[in-house]
A protein has these predicted regions:
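Short acidic-glycine loop/turn motifs at beta-strand connectors
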Residues: 24-27, 102-106, 120-124, 224-228
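N-terminal entry segment of metal-dependent catalytic domains or homologous docking segments
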Residues: 1-56, 115, 145-157, 214-221
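Short helix/loop capping segments that flank catalytic or ligand/cofactor-binding pockets
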Residues: 41, 119-120, 175-177
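Catalytic core of PPM/PP2C metal-dependent serine/threonine phosphatase domains
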Residues: 50, 63-120, 152-159, 212-215
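Generic enzyme active-site microenvironment
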Residues: 33, 112, 168
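Acidic loop->beta-strand submotif enriched in PP2C/PPM serine/threonine phosphatases
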Residues: 14-24, 29, 90-104, 108, ...
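C-terminal catalytic subdomain
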Residues: 16, 84, 148-228
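PP2C/PPM family metal-dependent serine/threonine protein phosphatase catalytic domain
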Residues: 2-15, 78-88, 119-160, 196, ...
Length: 228
């Protein structure tokens, strides 16, 4: 497996409000990405602590994840997030959440808020992305004091052949953000980079992501089949 990511601070930002983790756990791999809400002064802490909470809760979970409701797992992550932020004003720590959990024969993914994730398996690309159907462009769902389970979008699948997964914050827009745009981008990314080393992949992503249009923070995390 090749995994990693790149996060670039946006123009005019004092601190990068995005955070990501992409690394192995037990028999699988976790990608978790979060974008701190721009209007919140401590949202960079919110994004950091939810990524760390998700990784720690899932990697230390003692039971079979394949039979547990993923929303229940996210609830546990949310509770851990609140514990880690107990010394801060939680109202200033709101953040989005994107997760891909790749296990030996199943994948679970979740989205709360903007950004997108894609999963390339069995020669098909599946995705979760923010269609902005019920919000203005700068509005989104996010982690707050109470977890809004109804607005968590879940994707679960079994697979035979895993090829890759990408998770991006909303600073990275792909074309017109339609399903064919996400499908083509994912396939091209995996085809281009799956035969390169982690160091080569990260260096090349940095070279073009720094010039990506837009002034927001930009984060892309990935995992692909290939040589580490």
């Amino acid at each position: 497996m090749i995994s990693g990511g790149v996060s670039i601070i946006g123009n005019y930002h004092g601190v990068n409000q995005d955070y990501f983790i992409s690394k192995p756990y037990k028999d699988g791999h976790i990608i978790v990405v979060s974008d701190g809400i721009g209007s919140k002064s401590l949202s960079h802490l919110g994004s950091k602590y939810i990524c760390e909470s998700v990784y720690d809760v899932i990697s230390n979970y003692a039971f079979d994840l394949s039979v547990i409701s993923f929303k229940d797992i996210i609830y546990m992550c949310h509770e851990e997030w609140k514990k880690r932020l107990v010394d801060y004003d939680l109202k200033e720590c709101y953040a989005t959440l994107l997760i891909v959990l790749i296990s030996e024969n199943f994948i679970k993914a979740a989205r709360l808020g903007d950004g997108f994730l894609t999963i390339y398996a069995d020669d098909k690309v599946s995705f979760l992305y923010d269609k902005k159907e019920n919000y203005f462009a700068n509005e989104t769902d996010c982690l707050k004091e109470v977890l809004d389970r109804d607005n968590i979008e879940i994707l679960e699948m079994n697979y035979l052949k895993f090829q890759g997964a990408l998770v991006c914050t909303d600073g990275i827009e792909i074309g017109r953000m339609q399903e064919y745009d996400l499908t083509n981008f994912t396939k091209e990314f995996v085809d281009e980079y799956s035969n390169k080393s982690q160091e080569e992949v990260i260096t090349e992503i940095e070279s073009w992501l720094v010039d990506w249009p837009g002034i927001d923070d930009k984060t892309l995390a990935f995992v692909m089949e290939g040589e580490n």
